Amino acid sequence: MDMDDRFANAAYIPDGMSYPEKWARQAAAFRATAKAELDVRYGPSARQVMDVFHPEGTPKGTVVFVHGGYWVAFDKSFWSHLAAGPLAHGWSVTMPSYDLCPDVHISEITQQIEEAMRGLQGPLRLTGHSAGGHLVARLAGMPHVARVVPISPVADLTPLLQTQMNADLR
C-alpha cells in the first residue's frame, strides 16, 4: 500500500492541479469588493497575518476559517471567497495564515491559531478544511469557542508517519 499515493488528493480529482489557481482568483475577486481589513498582524513572523471580513451592521460573532494544505502549503489568500456565506448571515469572518512545517511544529501552528483568536468578538465559531479542520478541532475546548466545524479534517495522523511528507511534519 503506497501511503504517499493515498494522500495525493489532487491526483484523483479531474483537473485537480488547476484548483489552487482557481481558488486564488475567486478569493482575490472577493477581497476586491469585500468590507475587510487585510493582513492584520497577530504575531511576529511574516506569515502571522489575518484577513478580517465585516458584515453589514453589528456582527453576531466571529467565524474563524483555518486553511488546509497538510500544514505545508497555502495561506489565507486562497480562501477569502468562503467568507461570503457567514457574512451574508451577519457574522464577521477571520482568516489567519500561519507558519508552515517544516519551519515549525504542528503544535506551534495550533498556538498561532490560538493567538490569532485573541481579542476576536465572540461568540466564536471555528471551521477549517483538511489540516485546518485538524487545527480547529484541537482548539474546541478554548474559552469563547461556541462551535467547531472541521471540514474533511485530517483526523488520524498515524498514516502520515508512513509518507514522505512525514519528514516535513513535526
Protein language model features and the residues they cover:
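Short, surface-exposed "cap/lid" segments of acyl-processing enzymes
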Residues: 56-85
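Structural cue for short, hydrophobic secondary-structure segments
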Residues: 65-68, 95, 127
